[in-house]
Structures are given as structure tokens and as C-alpha cells.
């Protein structure tokens, strides 16, 4: 599986240049046994000793993350909007980022029940108490604890992974096709392209992904707009708005500002200044 470094793919990280001056983010591919379900493992490390705490805002992918930090193991469901993570002192976090719909093969509930929800691993995964015990006594300031923990997490998930195909894997493929081409596409267009009725598509997303298809399409459009904004020469915002399915530049600017916090032009200028 292709896992690109954050410098090449910062989708979901709001104002990455500012954040990456304060923490390091490494990405690792999953083992072959987990590649059907897991997109990547990520490791964040920081040392802000003697510096102001920093809150990194993210517009997370429409997926589940299993996160280990500060002695806890927590399953974070898909977030409906931006969320912030406060960093202070010295620390690390290990995350398992599942593929879209990938967590459904492990879960005992539809994923719409996990939107904007965080649960201890023991409540969200069969036998997840083992993961809570694995991280409980680790030094939260020692990044050397991450590698053996990651190996243990991989073994745990591989043992839990179903051998037979799960219906969610078809929905995963639909979402990943949207992610690869987030241009102008409505829910009805997507349903027709996939040979599904709109209501069936919506039910599959609610069960397997969490957010509905409209929200997922919108999320990937924002990623594309933010990535275009931070790279090289600022884009033609009017043309980009039409390409990504917004009615006009004003619509893109209004939606972008509501989600990201600043207009796209200002976001682009900030990104260029941070390089």
C-alpha cells in the first residue's frame, strides 16, 4: 500500500506547516494481514518543553482511528467537523488509521453510532482490554515505547481480523474511488456510477462508514481545496470551485471558511509563508 509522507499528502491536517514545526509525524504501512482494513499507522512525537502548548486542528478522514497516548487506548469514530489535539511537554501518540469502512469488520455496531464518539478500546473491540493493558504502564514521554507497542497492536488486530470478505469492503472501495477523484459528483451521480439506488447507498454508508455519502464527498472536496491552496501558485479559485462541485467561488469561500476557519486565499498565503 502506498503511504505517502506528510509533506506530500497533508490531507486532514489544518495548517500543516505550523503544526509540523512543533511535532513530527511519521507514517508506516500496515502488515499484509491488515492491509484490507488499515490504511496506515501514524506516530506523532513532540517536545515542547519550555514552549507554549500547541493545539493542532484536524479535519479528519471519514474513518476510525485507534489511538494510544498518555497511557490510554481509545477508538475515535469519524468526526463530523474539525477537532483539536492539545500538545504540551514531551510526548507521543500512536494511531491506527483504518481504511474507510475498514473498522466495520471488527465492530459489533453500525459505524454511524460512532460519529463524534470516543470509546475505550475495551468497549469498542472484542478483547480490547488487552490493548488498554499494553499501553497503561508505558512512559508517555518516551518515544522508544512506540515500536514494541505497534508490533503488539498489529498482532492483536491480525488475530481479530475476519478471514472471509465483509460487505463493508465493497463500500470501502466506493469511498476510496471518491477520495481519488473528488471532482463535481453528487450523491445521485455516485449511486448511478456504482449501480446502486440512492437509499441503498445511504444505508451502506451509515452502516459501514458512518457519515453519509454527501458528507464524505464534501470532506474530500475540502481536502482537495486545502491541498491546492498550500501547494505552489495559488489556484484559480473560481475554476476550482466549479471543478469541485461548488456553485461558484463565493460558495467555495463561504464553505471553506466555515470549516477551516479562514478564507482559502488567506489559508494559501499562510501556507506559503510557512514553507
Predicted regions and their residues:
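DNA major-groove recognition helix of helix-turn-helix
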Residues: 205, 217, 255-257, 268
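Alpha-helical bundle regulatory/interaction domains
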Residues: 1-198, 208-213, 227-231, 236-247, ...
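Hydrophobic side chains within alpha-helical segments
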Residues: 224, 251-252, 258
Amino acid at each position: 500500500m502506498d503511504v505517502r509522507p506528510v509533506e506530500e499528502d497533508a490531507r486532514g491536517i489544518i495548517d500543516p506547516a505550523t503544526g509540523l514545526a512543533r511535532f513530527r509525524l511519521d507514517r508506516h504501512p500496515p502488515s499484509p494481514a491488515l492491509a484490507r482494513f488499515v490504511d496506515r499507522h501514524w506516530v506523532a512525537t513532540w517536545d515542547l518543553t519550555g514552549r507554549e502548548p500547541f493545539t493542532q486542528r484536524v479535519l479528519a478522514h471519514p474513518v476510525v482511528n485507534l489511538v494510544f497516548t498518555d497511557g490510554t487506548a481509545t477508538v475515535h469514530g469519524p468526526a463530523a467537523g474539525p477537532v483539536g489535539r492539545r500538545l504540551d511537554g514531551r510526548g507521543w501518540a500512536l494511531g491506527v488509521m483504518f481504511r474507510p469502512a475498514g473498522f466495520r469488520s471488527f465492530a459489533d455496531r453500525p459505524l454511524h453510532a460512532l460519529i463524534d464518539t470516543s470509546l475505550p478500546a475495551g468497549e469498542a473491540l472484542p478483547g480490547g482490554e488487552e490493548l488498554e493493558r499494553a499501553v497503561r504502564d508505558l512512559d508517555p514521554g518516551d518515544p522508544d515505547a512506540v515500536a514494541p507497542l505497534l508490533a503488539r497492536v498489529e498482532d492483536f488486530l491480525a488475530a481479530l481480523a475476519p478471514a472471509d470478505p465483509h460487505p463493508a469492503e465493497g463500500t470501502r472501495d466506493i469511498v476510496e474511488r471518491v477520495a481519488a477523484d473528488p471532482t463535481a459528483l453528487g450523491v445521485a451521480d455516485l449511486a448511478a456510477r456504482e449501480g446502486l439506488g440512492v437509499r441503498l447507498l445511504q444505508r451502506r454508508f451509515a452502516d459501514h462508514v458512518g457519515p453519509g455519502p454527501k458528507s464524505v464527498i464534501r470532506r474530500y472536496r475540502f481536502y482537495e481545496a486545502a491541498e491546492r491552496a498550500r501547494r505552489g501558485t495559488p489556484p484559480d479559485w473560481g475554476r476550482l470551485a466549479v471543478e469541485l462541485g461548488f456553485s461558484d467561488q463565493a460558495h467555495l469561500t463561504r464553505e471553506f471558511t466555515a470549516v477551516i476557519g479562514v478564507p482559502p486565499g488567506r489559508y494559501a498565503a499562510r501556507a506559503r509563508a510557512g514553507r
